[in-house]
């Protein structure tokens, strides 16, 4: 058995040299494209979170959504899921990609944000602003990307008071929670397991709270110990009743 941390990049490398994986691989990846025989993906499925938050956004009355992302595999995966979900529900949408060149040039970045918002200099003196082009914005990029973009969106009249901001569980990070321009963002997340005793013990030993991957690593180590006592690995891993772990049921 091969146990994580085996993330998406490593899985891709394994697939390039091995056609048929014969031993069980318990991976930390959450990339559904990498599903395979004998490979189990145990990371949080970000695509599911995107579908949940879109459903919520539609219920709040969003009719036109801007999907904003960057030119990365992570962002493209979420954009693909969001676009498919919105088209199936008949919601008007625009996909807006920020290239690395634009993100690294403050002048180009400002210009693109102004173009998206329809901002004009004369709006600064108006008490009542024109209706925004979008009633919702879905962020699909990294934390760094979102932190670079959000203050500019806010400055150019696409702030969270005028437009509904949506995101996934990335928004639980302290970086995004503490960013003033992102206050009022709605985001989806899987339920955190109720494991106070484990967390308290972890803090006593290590002086900090365990991350999701720390909890998952603990689960996998314990699982491997149990698995070593089984004759048929595959049958045990895929048993009907599943497995109850600290990080959730699998």
What do the PLM-derived regions correspond to, one by one?
Residues 1-250:
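Extracytosolic ligand-binding ectodomains
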